Amino acid sequence: MPHKSKILLLDTGKEWGGGTNSMLELLKRINRDEFDITCCFYSDYSRAEGETIGQVLNGIGIPLIVIPQRQQPIWAKLLKEAGRSLLFFSRSARKAFTRHVDIMWRIRPNVSKIETLFKQGGFDTLYMNNQPGSNEEGYLAAAKLQARLIQHCRIEPVLTPPLVKLVNAHATKIIAVSHGVERVLLEHGVRPELCTTVNNAIDIHQPLPDRRAMRQRLNIDDDTFVFGSIGSLIPRKANHHTLDALAQFSQKHPEAKWKMVLVGEGGERRALAEQARALGIEHNVIFTGFQNTPFDYLATFDAFILASKSEGLPRVVLEAMLLNIPVIGSQVTGTAELIDHDSTGLLFPWSDVSQLAQNLDNIWSDADLLARLAAAAYQNVCHTYAIENYVSGVEAVLGAH
C-alpha cells in the first residue's frame, strides 16, 4: 500500500474569500487515498447565512482544529505606546519595536500551539494557505519541527528581506496561483527552485445559474445594462475608482439605463455608499452585502469590473468568463495574466479612472465588441483553467518527496 501523506493545512485568515473557495474546491477533489488532511484555522468563520467553515469542511469529511486568538493584552498595548513615544525619531525603530511586541504576545504562542498540534497529530507536512506574510508562525513552527513545508501563495505577496530569508531557509515548495505571483516571489529573492506555478481554476462543468431569475429578484429589467463586481469591500479592491468611472460614464450618457451591482461586504461599504450619493449615482448602485452564492449574482451582469490594486489569479474573473460575461480589469498581477487586452477582455492601468470610464463606454455601446470578447474569454477559460488541472498540479507538489 502506498504511503499516505498526513497533512496539516494552516489558514490564518479571518473571513471567507476567494482563497477559501479555492481551498474548498481542492479539498472536495483531492485524492483521499494519498492525502490525509486536517485543517487548522484561527477562526471558524462563517458565510452570510451562518454556515461556518467548520460545517462545510465536516460536510466533505475534513476535520477542523481551531486555535482561538486572544485579544491584544493591555501590557502589549502599553508597551507599543511607550515605544512610539520613546522612538519618535525613527520610524524603522518604531516598527521593529512593535513587531517585537507582536512576536511576544501573538506569534510565539501560535508557533507553540502549531508545533504541539503537528507532533500530536503525527503529521509529516505543513501546508499553508495564503502568503508568507500571513503564515509566518507556520514557518517558525516548521523550523523547530524540521518539517516539510508547502506554501500556497494565493495573492500577490508582500515580502520583506527578513521574511524572504525565512522562506528560503524553511520552505520545501511554494505554489504560486499565477506566473505573475511567481515572478513577484522571484523578484524579491525567493530561491527559484522553491517556486512553481499551478494556475487557479474553476469547475467548467458546473451548472450555470438562471440569469433572468436573479434579475427579477433584484428588480432589474431585461433592458437594463448591468455592470457588476464581486469581492470584499476593502481599499485594495479599489471600488471607489469604479464608482468614479461610472459617474463619468453617466455624465456622458445620461440616457443610458444601467445599474452597478456590488456583491460583497467590508469596511468600505459606508464610504462607497456615501461616494455614490455624492456622485449622484446612488439610485444606480446596488449593494447586496456578502452572498453565499455570488455565482448566481454574477450571472445577472452584462460586464464584470475588477479594479483592484493587486490580485493573485482571481477566480471570479474565470467565473465571469465561463458565463460569457466580458471582463474589464486593472492591469495588475493575476488579472492581466487572464486578460489579453481587446481579445479576451479590456484592461486599464490601475487607478486610471478615465481609461476605465472609456472601457465602460466601449462595452456598453458596442454589442459586437461585447460578444467577441466574451466568446474568446469563454474558449480560453475552458481550455486553460479547468479545475482538474489545478487539483492534479497541487497533488503533484504535495506528493513529491
Predicted regions, residues:
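A conserved mid-protein helix/loop that constitutes part of the nucleotide-sugar donor-binding site
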Residues: G17-E25, F225, S229-Q251, A256, ...
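A short helix/loop element that forms part of the nucleotide-sugar donor recognition site in Leloir-type
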Residues: Q55, P207-I220, R277, G393-A396
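Nucleotide-activated donor-binding/catalytic signature segment of Leloir-type glycosyltransferases, i.e.
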Residues: G61-L64, A273-G289
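A conserved, positively charged/aromatic
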Residues: A143-K144, L149-H179
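Carbohydrate-associated surface elements
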Residues: G180, A201
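Aromatic "clamp/platform" in nucleotide-sugar-dependent glycosyltransferases that forms part
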Residues: F290, K309
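Short hydrophobic beta-strand element within catalytic cores of glycosyltransferases
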Residues: P326-G329, I339
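Conserved acidic donor-binding segment of nucleotide-sugar-dependent glycosyltransferases
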Residues: D340-D342, L346-V353, N362-A367
